Amino acid sequence: RECQSQSHRYKGACVHDTNCASVCQTEGFSGGKCVGFRGRCFCTKHC
């Protein structure tokens, strides 16, 4: 199962999944992706 949590460090609108994933990795997650109309960065990890 994969868990999601909104990034605390990502600033601004999320446009590129790779940028989001890089920030998420610094937060201890395995990756991340942009979600929603406003472009929020959500981090993902196996749980």
Swiss-Prot record:
Gene3D superfamilies named in the record: Knottin, scorpion toxin-like
Record keyword Hydrolase present: no
CDD domains for the chain: Knot1
SMART domains membership: Knot1
Highest rank taxon of the organism: Eukaryota
Keywords (A to Z) from UniProt: Antimicrobial, Defensin, Disulfide bond, Fungicide, Plant defense
GO biological process: defense response to fungus; killing of cells of another organism
Protein name: Defensin Ec-AMP-D2
Organism expressing this protein natively: Echinochloa crus-galli
